[in-house]
Each structure stands twice: as C-alpha cells, then as structure tokens.
C-alpha cells in the first residue's frame, strides 16, 4: 500500500533542479533590474494575523486563505497577498523614511486564486510598490517598470491591459441599487457576459444614460486611441472625463518611452482585490492564458494603519512567467557559464585541485567526477549537460 503522505496536497508542487535554476535566474534578473531603478528590497513574514486581510476595502475572502491557530489562540494565516503586508510595514516601520519610497520584494503567496495562479495554492510573487506619490506619472512609471521587467526576462509577445476603476465606481456610486446588485454588475462586466448584463440592467430602475454606458463598458477595449474615440460618443459625466484624461496621460507617457505596442485599454476591467482606487492593469502573453502580472493604484489602503499615503505598484507571478518563457520558446539561451567535468587518472588529485581552482576563477562550473568507468562518465556528462570532459593524467 502506497502511503498517502508521499503525494503532494492539491495546489502545490515540487521544483526540480532545472526549474529551481530557471526560477533563480528570473528572480536574480528582476532584482538586478529593480535595484538599478532605485527600489529597495524588503521581506514580510509568512505568518500574519487573519484580521489584517479581513478589514475594510482590503477584505479577502476567508475561504481563499489558509488559516491556523497559534498557541495563544490567535487566528493566523499564511500570507495570502503581497501588498497588504508591505503596506503594514511602511505604515508602522517606515514613516520617517525619505518619500517617494520605492520598495520591492520576492516572496511566496498562499491563496486559492484561479484567475491569477490557475489551481495553484502556493505561488511565487515578485513585486514593486511606490509610496507617497499621487500622480499619473507614478502609475505610468510603474507600468513602464512592468514592461521593462518582462522584456528583461526575454518576453516580447506580451500585452499589458490597462483599466480605470474610477469610471465604473463613479457610475455605481450614482445608482440607487443594492450592494448585491452592484456586485453582480461588476461580475458580469468583468466576465463580459453581455446578454445577462443587459437583462439585469433592464430590470433595474436606473437612468437611461447610465444604462447605456454600463451596456457599452464591456465593449470598450482595444487600442488607447480607439477606446477613447468610442467613449467620446457616450453621455459621460465630468468625473468619468477626468478619469479618462488620467488614463490617456498614462498611455501617452508609456508611448513616449517607446512601449506603445505593449499596451491596450480595457474599461471593463475590474479589480479582484477591493483596495484598488484608480488605474489597474494586467499582463498576458498569447501563449499562456493566465495572468503574468497585475497591479494598480491603492491610495486608501494605508489609512487602515493610520497613515494617509498614496501608493501604486504591481506583482509578477514567477511560475507563470517560467511557463510563458517555456511555451513561447522565447527564453534566451541560458547557457550560463561553461560546465566542465574533471576526470582524474592515476590519483592526480593535486593537479585536479589546481585545474579546478583555475577554472572556477574564470567563472566556470567545475565538477570533479566520482565515476571511473569511461562509458558511465560519458552518459553522466550528456545527461547533466556538461560542455567538456577534461581528463587529468593518462588512462590505465
């Protein structure tokens, strides 16, 4: 009988050598890129209080989190989100630092989130956050950083879809409908369920102009210019106009950096987490149906910790990026340093040690063979991807 404990729980996975190496390369390249841009790395604990994620606008669903009780009887969770703990750290430990404050991190997230991580319950997340700036330039710079990060990893066939939560929120705030009805409207727009949305809107007692805009919002996606032209024909109010101007400024900024081909606009995009207050965005590739990155503005989040501080940021899903690189065959040839296998004959240990030291100083990977049979050595070298076998001494 096979013991059940040899199998993995649902939603987690083992990473073998090649995958670990590839993930390490991805994370190293991201951190190198971000440090060059002035971001500073922090790390939050794996365990947090449950209440941190269940208050106000940042509320996460309890059934999406992994909960446990400590020895004192306090309810804890495995970190289900990357942004909230960083916001807590900034508000409680970094108030006196120089702002704008640019933070980056790489850490594991534990959450059942099919949109962002498929069926994975544990996923690796790398992110950046900018605190203390309330401007479209900060949002634009964050999206540019996301694009530069994906390009630095070797991805080219990707698209960043940009949305604006202020538009839909402005419309919903003006409607005399229940919270459940608002939530249903948001869900239907998010899923682009046109027929059901239209049926629901016909039943609700709302202004005809509002009904028209809500019907059209799921259709408003595509190039920035095309979407703006379509919106101009709708009866929008001043709040929506200001939100659209902000979105347009961000798109112009990204285009000025030469990244216009990577962006599109989707006014029907909704935020999966409730703390977003403005611009939001998601990144995809054609080869992979899941999200590679997501982010946006969350100006009210730190108020929960007694600090009034605007913020914006994004997170990359490392494992999804690994898959995208593999599926799209876009990964740059990570040949890495030369890999040599030293084979010692006649007990020439001193010569082997000198040669190994010399090669290591040049940045090579050097392994001293523990095998003696020539055929076994050849098989081992091929399977390990060794570039060259170096023999020290003469074969007997």
From Swiss-Prot:
One of its GO terms (biological process) is histidyl-tRNA aminoacylation. CDD domains: HisRS-like_core. Pathway: Amino-acid biosynthesis; L-histidine biosynthesis; L-histidine from 5-phospho-alpha-D-ribose 1-diphosphate: step 1/9. This is ATP phosphoribosyltransferase regulatory subunit. Pfam families: tRNA-synt_His. One of its GO terms (cellular component) is cytoplasm. The keyword Transmembrane helix does not apply. The keyword Cytoplasm applies. Keywords: Amino-acid biosynthesis, Cytoplasm, Histidine biosynthesis. It is found in: Cytoplasm. One of its GO terms (molecular function) is catalytic activity, acting on a protein. Heteromultimer composed of HisG and HisZ subunits. The gene is hisZ. It comes from Alkaliphilus metalliredigens (strain QYMF). Belongs to the class-II aminoacyl-tRNA synthetase family. HisZ subfamily. Required for the first step of histidine biosynthesis. May allow the feedback regulation of ATP phosphoribosyltransferase activity by histidine. This function is generally fulfilled by the C-terminal part of HisG, which is missing in some bacteria such as this one.
